[in-house]
């Protein structure tokens, strides 16, 4: 590993610890790893470096794509920024040019790689799992199956795994890993899972366990774990169980850097407003939680790094926050005040205190006292599910489990300091029974694999709450509703603030009772006009109109609610319910400020289009598929020439366009647009400009041409059923059938002229493919030819992704890919 150690030092400036070398040895030898290491001990680089090393050295026995998943957007943003900064240094780019421009980030606020195409993708767990489950959060329903295949053949890293919901995202992640088997490499990282849960993952999934406890020499070397030079301990802990978190204690104990962590946004906001009045003038006060617009939160994150980050040079600051900073953010303080939370969550918070070398910190832990009358929300609900949600609002430890918080506080009060051994004892004492129950639930629910299969089949975003995260939130848009009842709106263009639905309804009831004017429109929902051409998602060009909503209407969950900005305030403390005349409105998203591209197509023939796709596959995909293509024989159970099958899929994906009734309106349009009549030309696309050609397209009945995907799917099935097997035939059939939409289930009547058949024969001959072609057939359903085995689903998702992306790229950049 000498070469690896040298590479590691070049990138980071440090010689790797022994445990970091062991991680690389295992991953690069084909093993999957669960890594149990405390915060601040270098686990991020431990997981990153094997991929970078394999990439730089062109190792074909390691995945060529890495997907790094985190539970919170804040964490993804922070780690992406840190890694990007390290790899963007001039000396690194000069030494290792293959590591340049590899990265992207895909979260709810950043969406620069919606199809997961970069080599290294930092993502929230919601984005990663929604892709695999075929309801990708940022994409339309028609594109539901385009991203699942990105995880096939990838190196999957799950950071802060303990923060995932055990019944939902955690179980679904484990189920996904079981389904992918050897078609991926995996590194799961955790600081606070119990020993029992770690052993469960090891036994069920065949992982290798690496624990910092097995590397005592590393513990001695890791400066962030050692006490400051003049101290015998790293962190002191004081439990203040008889009082709630308060501004007086915060100011009295403040030295240079103080972090305050509250369980609820309201508590954080109230503390911020109190401290703003009484703090010293030269003390900088910062606040971060979930109720900020994305653009403002990004600014806050940057400021937090400047004051609390590793290389900070600014001093005298107090940060008020919620759990959004409790993991992943590389920040530190000398004083921390925190409300109690379950011990695994608390230890994550404590990881932001005295995090760096030669630091000492004091941590003050507070119980959460009874809710004030203002915080108690009385709402009636009809559904049992809703009643349970409302009952949660009465829990003073919300959003956490009451018994776990109480037990954590009791056990924590037995100690006056924190180190690795104490942390492990606390985790195992407080969480063992609870996590053993969770293990039982995961096994009983078969790792959510049945739900995964259902989701592949229907691609329904409603499955989010049963597979990833059971969050009932409403996205709030602040607008001038008083003067804009009849204005057209575009719901997708605004930055929003996310609020828990039942908290919002509690606010709404109080607002409704204290209206400025009985006729006010306080709450509205965007609805499309009857004349709309709306297709699939919010990003349709057509506008929406507002419909007034009553408080009762809010119980039915809507994605976006427009609210009257006179009843809400938005300040440095974030969104609050407070009548004002500030006229604050939601900002426009940065991406929507850009001019929208006009839809255009350039004419290409059937032959040219397929050649462009095949060249696109060679140029953009083939080199990065070496790992997965090598692993497929073991996964599938027999040797199959999948590369040849991908080429056959491409050649037949538009076979239905050879249909005479498909060609007729296309040729008529092209003839009338250009004045050139070429009756034997076989088209894939015509020249088209959305601004000038809409009327001509209607006259030529372009939209009335029959769907084409099903015809190619049927043809592929007939060719492959005998030559390979029914399993292979179903995989390729469905990839073609669903290459425009997962909802396609049949093919229409078709009749293909002989001169068109000659074109497909030419393609088959050029790529040494064989098959007899069906010229005419009556349409029928293909619903019975669907994947029934997990391996069929996985390979279908892998191939349909390649097909769809090649189709997009070859259509958008025809000149680039059409090479004879």
Map each language-model feature to its residues:
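Interdomain hinge/linker at the junction between the two RecA-like core domains of SF2 helicases
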Residues: 193-254
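Conserved pre-motif I regulatory segment
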Residues: 1-36
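Inter-Walker segment of RecA-like/P-loop motor cores
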Residues: 87-138
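C-terminal helicase lobe and adjacent C-terminal extensions/tails of nucleic-acid helicase motors
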Residues: 270, 277-283, 288-301, 341-580, ...
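Walker A/P-loop
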Residues: 30-50
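Conserved Walker A/P-loop ATP-binding site and its immediately adjacent core
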Residues: 44-45, 62-87, 193-197, 265
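Divalent metal-dependent catalytic cores for phosphoryl transfer on phosphate-bearing substrates
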Residues: 397-415, 419, 634-820
């Amino acid at each position: 590993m000498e070469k690896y150690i040298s590479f590691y030092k070049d990138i980071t400036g440090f010689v790797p610890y022994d445990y970091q070398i062991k991680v690389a040895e295992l991953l690069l030898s084909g093993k999957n790893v669960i890594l149990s290491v405390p915060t601040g001990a270098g686990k991020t680089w431990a997981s990153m470096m094997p991929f970078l090393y394999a990439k730089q050295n062109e190792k074909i026995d390691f995945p060529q794509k890495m997907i790094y998943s985190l539970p919170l957007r804040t964490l993804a943003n922070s780690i992406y920024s840190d890694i990007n900064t390290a790899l963007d240094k001039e000396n690194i780019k000069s030494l290792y040019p293959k590591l340049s421009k590899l990265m992207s980030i895909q979260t709810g606020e950043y969406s620069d790689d919606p199809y997961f195409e970069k080599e290294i993708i930092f993502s929230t767990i919601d984005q990663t799992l929604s892709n695999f489950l075929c309801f990708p959060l940022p994409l339309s329903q028609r594109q539901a199956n385009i991203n699942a295949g990105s995880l096939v053949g990838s190196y999957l890293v799950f950071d802060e795994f303990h923060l995932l919901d055990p019944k939902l995202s955690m179980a679904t992640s484990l189920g996904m890993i079981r389904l992918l088997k050897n078609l991926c490499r995996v590194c799961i990282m955790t600081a606070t899972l119990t020993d029992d849960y770690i052993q469960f993952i090891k036994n069920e999934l065949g992982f290798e366990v690496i624990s910092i406890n097995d590397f005592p020499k590393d513990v001695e070397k890791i400066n962030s774990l050692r006490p400051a030079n003049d101290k015998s301990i790293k962190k002191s802990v004081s439990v203040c169980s008889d009082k709630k978190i308060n501004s007086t204690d915060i100011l009295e104990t403040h030295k240079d850097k103080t972090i305050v962590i509250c369980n609820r946004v309201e508590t954080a906001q109230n503390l911020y407003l109190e401290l703003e009045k009484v703090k010293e003038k030269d003390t900088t006060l910062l606040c971060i939680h979930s109720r900020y617009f994305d653009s403002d939160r990004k600014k806050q994150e940057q400021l937090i790094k400047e004051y609390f980050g590793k290389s900070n040079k600014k001093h005298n600051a107090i940060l008020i926050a919620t759990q959004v900073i409790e993991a992943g953010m590389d920040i530190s303080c000398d004083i921390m005040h925190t409300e109690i939370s379950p011990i695994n969550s608390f230890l994550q918070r404590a990881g932001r205190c005295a995090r760096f070398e030669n630091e000492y910190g004091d941590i003050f832990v507070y119980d959460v006292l009874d809710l004030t009358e203002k915080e108690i929300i009385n709402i009636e609900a009809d559904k049992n599910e809703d009643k349970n949600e409302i009952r949660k609002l009465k829990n003073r430890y919300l959003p956490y489990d009451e018994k776990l918080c109480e037990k954590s506080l009791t056990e924590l009060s037995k100690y006056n300091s924190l180190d690795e051994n104490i942390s492990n004892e606390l985790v195992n004492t407080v969480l063992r029974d609870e996590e053993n129950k969770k293990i039982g639930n995961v096994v009983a629910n078969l790792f959510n694999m049945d739900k995964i299969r259902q989701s592949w089949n229907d691609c329904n975003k409603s499955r989010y709450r049963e597979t990833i995260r059971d969050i009932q939130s409403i996205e709030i848009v602040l607008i001038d509703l008083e003067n804009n009842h009849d204005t057209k709106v575009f719901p997708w263009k605004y930055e929003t603030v996310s609020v828990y639905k039942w908290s919002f309804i509690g606010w709404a009831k109080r607002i409704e009772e204290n209206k400025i004017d009985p006729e006010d429109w306080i709450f509205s929902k965007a609805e499309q006009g009857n004349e709309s051409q709306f297709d699939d998602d919010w990003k349709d060009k057509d506008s929406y109109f507002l419909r007034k909503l009553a408080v009762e209407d809010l119980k039915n969950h809507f994605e976006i609610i427009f609210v009257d900005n006179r009843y809400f305030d938005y300040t440095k403390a974030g969104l609050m319910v407070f009548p004002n005349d500030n006229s604050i409105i939601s900002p426009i998203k940065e991406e929507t400020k850009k001019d929208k591209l006009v839809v255009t197509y350039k004419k290409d023939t059937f032959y040219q289009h397929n050649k462009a796709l095949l060249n696109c596959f060679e140029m953009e995909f083939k080199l990065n598929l070496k790992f997965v293509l090598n692993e497929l024989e073991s996964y599938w159970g027999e040797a199959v020439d999948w590369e040849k099958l991908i080429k056959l899929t491409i050649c037949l994906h538009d076979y239905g366009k050879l249909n005479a009734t498909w060609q007729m309106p296309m040729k008529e349009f092209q003839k009338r647009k250009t004045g050139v009549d070429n009756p034997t030309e076989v088209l894939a696309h015509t020249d088209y400009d959305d601004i000038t050609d809409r009327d001509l397209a209607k006259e030529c009945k372009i939209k009335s041409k029959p769907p084409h995907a099903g015809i190619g799917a049927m043809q592929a099935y007939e060719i492959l059923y005998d030559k390979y097997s029914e399993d292979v035939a179903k995989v390729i059939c469905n990839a073609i059938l669903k290459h425009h939409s997962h909802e396609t289930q049949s093919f229409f009547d078709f009749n293909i002229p002989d001169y068109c058949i000659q074109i497909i024969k030419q393609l088959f001959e050029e790529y040494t493919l064989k098959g007899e072609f069906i010229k005419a057939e009556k349409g029928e359903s293909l619903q019975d030819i669907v994947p029934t085995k997990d391996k069929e689903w996985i390979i279908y998702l892998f191939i349909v992704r390649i097909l769809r992306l090649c189709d997009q790229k070859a259509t958008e950049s025809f000149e680039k890919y059409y090479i004879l």
